[in-house]
Amino acid sequence: MLRTALTRSSRALCSGARVAAQRPIASQIFQMQAARTAAPQLRSAARWYSAEAEGEKKADEGAEQKEGETDEVAALKKQLEAKDAEAREWKDKCLRTVADFRNLQERTARDVKQAKDFAIQKFAKDLVESVDNFERALSVVPQDKLKSEEQSEHLKDLVNLYEGLKMTESILLSTLKKHGLERIEPEGEVFNPNEHEATFMAPMPDKEHNVVFHVQQKGFKLNGRVLRPAQVGVVKNK
C-alpha cells in the first residue's frame, strides 16, 4: 500500500510538473496571440489619437491664424480710415484755398478795374469846371438874337461864334462820354437823391409833385458813379 501511495504521489508530482511546465508556454502563446490581435486596434487607436491631436493642433493654428488675420484687417481698416480722414481734410483745405484764391483774383480784378475807372477822378472834377464854363458862355448869348432874321455883320459873327462853341462843347462831351464821364441833365425827371441835390423847393400847380423843374448846375457821373450831383429845384405841391 505504501508503495502504491508513493507511486501515486510520484505520478501526481510528475503530472503537476508537466502541467506547470506546459502552463507558461500556453500563457506565452495566449499573450502573443492577444498581442497580435490587439496590435491593429492599438495602431488604429494610436492613429485616431494622432489624427485627433493633429486636427486639434490645426484647428488651434487656424484659429490663431484667423485671429491674426482679423487683427491685421482691423489695423488696415484703421489705417484706411485715417488716410480717408486725412484725404478729406486735405481736399477741404485745397477747396478752401482755391476758393480764397478765386475770391482774391476777383477782388484784385475789381480793385484794378475800380482804380482804372476812377484814376482820372480828380482830373475829371477839374475838367467839368471847363465844361461848365462852356455852358455859361453859351447861355450869355440871347436866344432872340440867334433867331433874328435880319442880322448885321456883327450879329452874324456872334452867331458863328455861338455855333462854334456849341459844336466844341458837343465834341468835348462826346469825348468825355467815351471815357466814362457823362453829364446829368435831370430837368423834368423825378427827384433822385442819389444823383440830385435839391437847393430849393417850390409849389407849382401845373407840375407834378417831386419833379425837377429847374437846374441850377448840371451834374456829372464817372463810370456810373456820381462825380458831382446836379443842383436842382424841386416841385413841392404837398
UniProtKB/Swiss-Prot annotation:
Keyword Transcription recorded: no
Recorded superkingdom: Eukaryota
Alphabetized Gene3D superfamilies for the sequence: 3.90.20.20, Head domain of nucleotide exchange factor GrpE
Gene Ontology cellular-component terms listed: PAM complex, Tim23 associated import motor
GO biological process, one term: protein import into mitochondrial matrix
Protein location: Mitochondrion matrix
Record GO terms (molecular function): adenyl-nucleotide exchange factor activity; protein homodimerization activity; protein-folding chaperone binding; unfolded protein binding
Quaternary context: Component of the PAM complex, at least composed of hsp70-5/ssc1, grpe/mge1, tim44, un-4/pam16, pam17 and tim14/pam18.
Known function: Essential component of the PAM complex, a complex required for the translocation of transit peptide-containing proteins from the inner membrane into the mitochondrial matrix in an ATP-dependent manner. Seems to control the nucleotide-dependent binding of mtHSP70 (hsp70-5) to substrate proteins.
Family the entry assigns: Belongs to the GrpE family.
UniProt-recorded name of the protein: GrpE protein homolog, mitochondrial
Protein species of origin: Neurospora crassa (strain ATCC 24698 / 74-OR23-1A / CBS 708.71 / DSM 1257 / FGSC 987)
Taxonomic lineage of the native organism: Eukaryota, Fungi, Dikarya, Ascomycota, Pezizomycotina
Gene, per the UniProt record: grpe
